[in-house]
């Protein structure tokens, strides 16, 4: 690897860490807990056997079965795991241009990974030849005098790399890759040290990783303080190895998980609710730094690596979890849908919720959505954390509601079709600037369902509490306590432009012109009021500045808007 490529990889990694910091978490305790479970429950004699078979020049179906069986045993013992999740990316948080970029890069990544797994070695294409074919080819090449190109002995110089001779190559998928908990357990057990010694050694390695990618010289110096690190093999490739190998990559990944507050990419957890936001942030860094999918087969660069890991499973710990139960590859498990535009469609008065209900259509939350809301944990909101709330519209007829927690960056944001159209048009002109047809696709019943799901005796902070209090009381939530910061209009909105500049992509519903009447006559155009943006700017006003953290939407889009037109049941 050239020096320029190392610098670029480091820059890409650091920039991705900054942009995705809001999706990172502290997982040291969970990793150590899984390592303890492996130390007590895993058969390390079988671990030793799998390490042995991974050193073989050729491996067969029997070897693969042993690897898969041991991987399944590990999967059964740990809690950090990714689950099978088919993700479909559509226009919403991601723009149509974003989707085109993702589709193209996933296709390039597919091509690169395919070429890497069937590599060129010393100029000779191996293909997917069986052991018998490789032996036959070696004999033929020896016969014609090409003994140094494609012999079957040890070492890469003879043109033969370690190969799996198996009937079904798909069974190899997702059986490799490293897990910090497994690396930690293997170092502890096979290095015959205390678990805490291994944790301390990996923590120091992780601290170096926050500034640069550790190399063999760094490891040698660190091994003087932590002899257990002598087990790490810096010459071992990170390609096509099992989680039981002591590669430098495996140790560095484990070290990243030992840091609390390091904003390491290895600690990202993806869910159906956060996937679009994560990909949006990745594309932002790609655009600013010119990141790309390389045509050269081999190890993945930071952009290729995070794109593959996020798209492999839309539910779980993308870098560090057990993924042995996942079927398929990243480009199979994440599909880009360029056909459907999921923005709320202007379908006219005939498509409003009231018209649908009068025509006999079922308009409202379906059972699975109600069950999701019933468990407040699904909100990802912390019950006792500072929570802002704001509404647009009248308390008896709200059209937009937002809840925002600055500590986590999580927010709930949804809309409602108004019943008083005349009052709505007045409010649109002087406050929120919405088009009523954009609200016809709003999911009915969501306001009551969300307010009902809020924890009892919750404390909510707001700027102006009267309307919010009336709304909560109308839903029977007198137990919720309100803190009104009562700032002046100018003070509460002093970060308005900064908030809209930074977070404008979070809401596209304010399309109209809003005016404000002046005391001495005349009118002046102002920025439309958005419940979510107001929550963010009110918090900035109280805190004295705007936090640059990444915000995470809680409610999936299909819960906020109806994504398809109901059908009449005949």
From Swiss-Prot:
Its main location: virion. One of its GO terms (biological process) is RNA-templated viral transcription. The keyword Metal-binding applies. It comes from the Viruses. Belongs to the arenaviridae nucleocapsid protein family. Encapsidates the genome, protecting it from nucleases. The encapsidated genomic RNA is termed the nucleocapsid (NC). Serves as template for viral transcription and replication. The increased presence of protein N in host cell does not seem to trigger the switch from transcription to replication as observed in other negative strain RNA viruses. Residues 54-241 are annotated as: Binding site for the cap structure m7GTP. InterPro entries: Nucleocapsid_arenaviridae, Nucleocapsid_C_arenaviridae, Nucleocapsid_C_sf, Nucleocapsid_N_arenaviridae. The record marks 467 as: Important for exonuclease activity. This is Nucleoprotein. Zn(2+) binds at residues 400, 507, 510, 530. GO terms for cellular component: helical viral capsid; host cell cytoplasm; ribonucleoprotein complex; viral nucleocapsid. Mn(2+) binds at residues 390, 392, 534. The gene is N. It holds the Pfam family Arena_ncap_C. It comes from Lassa virus (strain GA391). Its EC number is 3.1.13.-. Homomultimerizes to form the nucleocapsid. Binds to viral genomic RNA. Interacts with glycoprotein G2. Interacts with protein Z; this interaction probably directs the encapsidated genome to budding sites. Interacts with protein L; this interaction does not interfere with Z-L interaction. Interacts with host IKBKE (via Protein kinase domain); the interaction inhibits IKBKE kinase activity.
């Amino acid at each position: 690897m050239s020096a320029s490529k190392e610098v670029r990889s480091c820059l890409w990694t650091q920039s991705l860490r900054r942009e995705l910091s809001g999706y990172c978490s502290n997982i040291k305790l969970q990793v150590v807990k899984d390592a303890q479970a492996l130390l007590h429950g895993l058969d390390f004699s079988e671990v030793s056997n799998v390490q042995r078979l991974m050193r073989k020049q050729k491996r067969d179906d029997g070897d693969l079965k042993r690897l898969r069986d041991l991987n399944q045993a590990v999967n059964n013992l740990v809690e950090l795991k990714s689950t099978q999740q088919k993700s479909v990316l559509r226009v919403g948080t991601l723009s149509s241009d974003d989707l085109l970029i993702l589709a193209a890069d996933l296709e390039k990544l597919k091509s690169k990974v395919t070429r890497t797994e069937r590599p060129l070695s010393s100029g000779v294409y191996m293909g997917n030849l069986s052991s018998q074919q490789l032996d036959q080819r070696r004999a033929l090449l020896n016969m014609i005098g090409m003994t140094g190109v494609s012999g079957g002995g040890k070492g890469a110089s003879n043109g033969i790399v370690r190969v799996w001779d198996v009937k079904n190559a798909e069974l190899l998928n997702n059986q490799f890759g490293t897990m910090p908990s497994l690396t930690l357990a293997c170092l502890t057990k096979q290095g015959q040290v205390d678990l805490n010694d291994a944790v301390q050694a990996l923590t120091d390695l992780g601290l170096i990783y926050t500034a640069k990618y550790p190399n063999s010289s760094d490891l040698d110096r660190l091994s003087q303080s932590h002899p257990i690190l002598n087990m790490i093999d810096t010459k071992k490739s990170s390609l096509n190895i099992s989680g039981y190998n002591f590669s430098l990559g495996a140790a560095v990944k484990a070290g990243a998980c030992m840091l609390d507050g390091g904003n390491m990419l290895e600690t990202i957890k993806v869910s159906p609710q956060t996937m679009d936001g994560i990909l949006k942030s990745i594309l932002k860094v790609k655009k600013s730094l010119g990141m790309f999918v390389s045509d050269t087969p081999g190890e993945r660069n930071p952009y290729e690596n995070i794109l593959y890991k996020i798209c492999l499973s839309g539910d779980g710990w993308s870098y560090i979890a057990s993924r042995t139960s996942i079927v398929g590859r990243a480009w199979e498990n994440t599909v880009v849908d360029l056909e459907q535009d999921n923005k709320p469609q202007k379908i006219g008065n005939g498509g409003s919720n009231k018209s649908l209900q009068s025509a006999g259509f079922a308009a409202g939350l379906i059972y699975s959505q109600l069950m999701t809301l019933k468990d407040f944990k699904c909100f990802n909101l912390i019950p006792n954390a500072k929570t802002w709330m704001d509404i647009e519209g009248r308390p008896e007829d709200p059209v937009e509601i937002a809840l925002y927690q600055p500590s986590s960056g999580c927010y709930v944001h949804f809309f409602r079709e108004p019943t008083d159209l005349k009052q709505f048009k007045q409010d649109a002109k002087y406050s929120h600037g919405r088009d009523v047809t954009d609200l016809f696709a709003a999911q009915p019943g969501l306001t009551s369902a969300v307010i009902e799901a809020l924890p009892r005796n919750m404390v909510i902070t707001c700027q102006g509490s009267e309307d919010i209090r009336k709304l909560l009381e109308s839903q029977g939530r007198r137990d919720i306590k309100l803190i009104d910061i009562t700032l002046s209009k100018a003070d509460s909105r002093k970060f308005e432009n900064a908030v809209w500049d930074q977070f404008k992509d979070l809401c596209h519903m304010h399309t109209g012109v809003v005016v404000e009447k002046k005391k001495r006559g005349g009118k002046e155009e102002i920025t439309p009021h958005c419940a979510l943006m107001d929550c963010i700017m009110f918090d900035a006003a109280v805190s004295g500045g705007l936090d640059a953290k990444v915000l995470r939407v809680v409610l999936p889009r299909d819960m906020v808007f109806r994504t398809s037109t109901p059908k009449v049941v005949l």
